[in-house]
Every structure is written in structure tokens, then in C-alpha cells.
């Protein structure tokens, strides 16, 4: 299977975790785009979706899936999203598509977080993929200096503004041995909205597409 075929296979498998008449949390990214296509096949069986980005909202609506504001939803049974990296402990780096804050909010509300990915995303240690940090614009330089103190090499992602009106610093050369501690430490920097470590609230289930087929890891 090609990488896209692995992503698509994982996306289709994730439909098995979607119950009828529920509102589905939907993430953002290339793998999630396959999931949205798959979800459209059962759109008449679900109540609708909550989306983590403007891009996913457009795709969902284009398929005739109703999109709810998260503030109007008390509970989400399932949130389905991809990852840039994920470990066997279900900690992730996310945010390559700059939607990390909304992704983290929707994940916090969901009872179950299902990560869909191809096997290139599974790693032993997080940090080869640069860690995105969403920052209030006026704090960009200050936050960058603080991230250097933590051993990282932050790079301003030019030309990118998040759905929340903020900027992204991509932090290179971090060997993340304690994801929960680093997630907390970076979030404590004044001016940081959040960072792309999903360790305090990691995935509950990983649906992994590989050349050998689909693995479901819990």
C-alpha cells in the first residue's frame, strides 16, 4: 500500500468506533481528510460533527454533515484525528497544520480520542518532527528566547496565522523524553497559547495503517 492508501485504510477502520446518533469530533490534516470522506458514507446515521479547524468545517459541510459549535455540545463520545508523531505510550506531536489549539480543546471534551495514522508516524521518542507552539503575536520573540533555554531551536512559521489569529513557532532539535513535563513547561511560558504535545491528554486508541494491514492499538 502507498502512504495515502494506509491513511485511507486507517480512516475507514475508524468508522467502526462511531456510534449512531452521536456527534463526532473531527480533527484536521491529510489523514483526517480521508476520514471525512469515509464519514460522509454514514452521515445519515450520525447527528453531526464538531470540527477543530475552518478547513475541516468546510470539508464536512461540503459533504452535507452538520457542524456544531463546541459550546453547544455537552459531550463528545469520540474525537478522531491524526498525528505528526505518536509513541507506543500514545503521546503525540500534532499541529503541523497549525490547528493544535482547537484540536487540543476538542480532544479535552471527548470521552475517547482515536488517532488515525500511517506507520511512518509511529516513533520511539518524540521530537524528530518539529514541535509547533502557538503564540500570541506580540510575545513571539520572548517565547522564542525561552524555548532556546529549553534546548530547542525555534523557527517562526512565516505566512501562517492560526484560526485564532496567532502565530506558530516550530521548535527543532528537541529530544522529548518526558512529554508530559515538557508540555506543562512550555505551556507555562507567558504568551504561549498551547503547544503541539498531546501527552497530558494522549490518544486512547491508535488505528495504524501499514503495508501489512491495519493495527488497532489500545
UniProtKB/Swiss-Prot annotation:
Q: What's its EC?
A: 5.3.1.6
Instruction: Give, as in the UniProt entry, the pathway in which the protein acts.
Output: Carbohydrate degradation; pentose phosphate pathway; D-ribose 5-phosphate from D-ribulose 5-phosphate (non-oxidative stage): step 1/1
InterPro entries linked to this entry: NagB/RpiA_transferase-like (IPR037171), Ribose5P_isomerase_typA_subgr (IPR020672), Ribose5P_isomerase_type_A (IPR004788)
- The record places the active site at 103
Check the record and name the CDD domains matching this protein.
RPI_A
Q: Could you provide one GO biological process annotation from this protein's UniProt record? A: D-ribose metabolic process
Q: Name one GO cellular component term.
A: cytosol
MF-aspect GO terms: ribose-5-phosphate isomerase activity
Residues binding substrate are 28-31, 81-84, 94-97, 121
Q: Which cysteines are joined by disulfide bonds?
A: none
Question: Reaction catalysed?
Answer: aldehydo-D-ribose 5-phosphate = D-ribulose 5-phosphate
**Keywords of this protein's UniProt record, alphabetized?**
Isomerase
| Entry-linked Pfam families | Rib_5-P_isom_A
What does this chain do?
Catalyzes the reversible conversion of ribose-5-phosphate to ribulose 5-phosphate.
Spell out the NCBIfam families in the cross-references: PRK00702.1, rpiA
Q: Describe the protein's quaternary organization and the partners it interacts with.
A: Homodimer.
Q: Which family does it belong to?
A: Belongs to the ribose 5-phosphate isomerase family.
Q: What is this protein called?
A: Ribose-5-phosphate isomerase A
Which species is listed as the source? Answer: Colwellia psychrerythraea (strain 34H / ATCC BAA-681)
Q: What is the lineage of its organism?
A: Bacteria, Pseudomonadati, Pseudomonadota, Gammaproteobacteria, Alteromonadales
